[in-house]
Structure formats: C-alpha cells, structure tokens
Swiss-Prot record:
<dbReference type="InterPro" id="IPR027310">
    <property type="entry name" value="Profilin_CS"/>
</dbReference>
<dbReference type="GO" id="GO:0046718">
    <property type="term" value="P:symbiont entry into host cell"/>
</dbReference>
<dbReference type="InterPro" id="IPR048278">
    <property type="entry name" value="PFN"/>
</dbReference>
<keyword id="KW-1035">Host cytoplasm</keyword>
<comment type="function">
    <text>Participates in either intracellular transport of viral proteins or intercellular spread of the virus. Cellular profilins modulate actin filament dynamics (polymerization and depolymerization) via direct binding to actin through an actin-binding domain as well as by modulation of other actin-binding proteins. In contrast to cellular homologs, the poxvirus profilins seem to bind actin only weakly.</text>
</comment>
<keyword id="KW-0945">Host-virus interaction</keyword>
<keyword id="KW-1176">Cytoplasmic inwards viral transport</keyword>
<comment type="subunit">
    <text>Interacts with host TPM1. Interacts with protein A25.</text>
</comment>
<dbReference type="GO" id="GO:0030430">
    <property type="term" value="C:host cell cytoplasm"/>
</dbReference>
<keyword id="KW-1178">Actin-dependent inwards viral transport</keyword>
<keyword id="KW-1160">Virus entry into host cell</keyword>
<keyword id="KW-0009">Actin-binding</keyword>
<comment type="similarity">
    <text>Belongs to the profilin family.</text>
</comment>
<dbReference type="GO" id="GO:0039680">
    <property type="term" value="P:actin-dependent intracellular transport of virus towards nucleus"/>
</dbReference>
<dbReference type="Pfam" id="PF00235">
    <property type="entry name" value="Profilin"/>
</dbReference>
<dbReference type="GO" id="GO:0043657">
    <property type="term" value="C:host cell"/>
</dbReference>
<protein>
    <recommendedName>
        <fullName>Profilin</fullName>
    </recommendedName>
</protein>
Length: 133
C-alpha cells in the first residue's frame, strides 16, 4: 500500500520522533516501510509473532533491542495499542498500534512525552483502519 510510505515520510519530517516502521503482521510479518538504517528497519518475523500472540510479554525484542512493556492492549479491538520504553539508555517511549493488516511502530526521542507518541501513532492507525486496511 502506497500510504505506508506516506505515513513514514510524514513521521520522519517531525522532529519529535526518532524512528518509525510499518510491519505486516497477517501474512509475511516483514517490514513494509521504515526509516532507513534505524532500529525498526531491522525488525524480523521472529520478533512480531510474540507481540501478537503473547499477551503477557514483558521484555520483547524489537529490532534486536530489548524493550519494556508499559501497557499492552495491542489485540484489544477498542484500544489496539501497546506502550513500551526502550530497555537501554537513553530511555525513549515506543508505541505500537495495530491496523487490520499491519503494526505501526513509533519511537519518540528521549525528550518527547509518551502521550505525544501515543496520540500520533493511534491517529495514524485510526486513519488507516477507517480505510479498511
């Protein structure tokens, strides 16, 4: 879908965010779009499966780096988001939002509030969900 690259482009222009990626979780579990040469560009299928199947996951690997789960409502139809923090310094907020076909990963800079990252990621996911993807 061409809209994925547009979302990543939109996020990369914003100075509040460090990294972003969109990953298919229904079929291939591959990265569909990402900011090049960043952590989320290295996400592999083995890291996606535990996120969507294990509701009690505490320290998932994302892009070969550990993260700490803050809230997990990823598979909930009303919330469809998971909040995490990086497990390494400097600590940055991460939000994963679920559309019908993909996961949107968004990492804020250490100075960006969790609320800003959450709101932005959820807004993009809600917009994509409205189109049916």
């Amino acid at each position: 879908m061409a809209e994925w690259h547009k979302i990543i482009e939109d996020i990369s222009k914003n100075n509040k965010f460090e990294d972003a990626a969109i990953v298919d979780y229904k079929t291939t579990k591959n990265v569909l779009a990402a900011i090049p040469n960043r952590t989320f560009a290295k996400i592999n299928p083995g890291e996606i499966i535990p996120l969507i199947t294990n509701r009690n996951i505490l320290k998932p690997l994302i892009g070969q780096k550990y993260c700490i789960v803050y809230t997990n409502s990823l598979m909930d139809e009303n919330t469809y988001a998971m909040e995490l923090l990086t497990g390494y310094a400097p600590v940055s907020p991460i939000v994963i939002a679920r559309t019908h076909t993909a996961l949107i990963f968004l990492m804020g800079k250490p100075t960006t509030s969790r609320r800003d990252v959450y709101r932005t990621c959820r807004d993009h996911a809600t917009r994509v969900r409205a189109t049916g993807n």
